[in-house]
Amino acid sequence: MKRRPSTWKDPKTVMEWQYESPGEMTWYEALEYAQSLSLDGKDDWRIPTVLELDTLLDRKTLFDKMRPDMRKEVPFRDTLSYWSSTTFAEHTKNAWIVMFDGAYVLSYYKTNHYHVRCVRGQEIIK
């Protein structure tokens, strides 16, 4: 049986992504999880920014459809909601999430439970 990889390197952004989400957790738990994560001998994992999560989507399909799909080369495909590290500026008890079932970007309380998929590499903030 072929074993699934633990990471995936994005050829577009050169960021390395955690392949499997460990499940749902609060934003605070997600930060702790990322700080303790070690995959493939690397321990510099972090929660992605909202812009980094957005790089997984093919926004060009937005004109053909109501909701963009994940880019074709992204190997993990799901319709779950993921935490970003980006705090909502107007209400710091909230952070941005990306809902991949509709490519929605929304802010929710950091005490809510959403999935996390860690990333490593040069941070995209603009």
Residue map of PLM features:
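Short, structured beta-strand segments at or near domain termini in extracellular proteins/domains
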Residues: 81, 107-126
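Short solvent-exposed loop/turn micro-motifs enriched in small/polar/acidic residues
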Residues: 1-2, 75-76, 110-111
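Extracellular adhesion/carbohydrate-recognition regions
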Residues: 1-45, 115-119
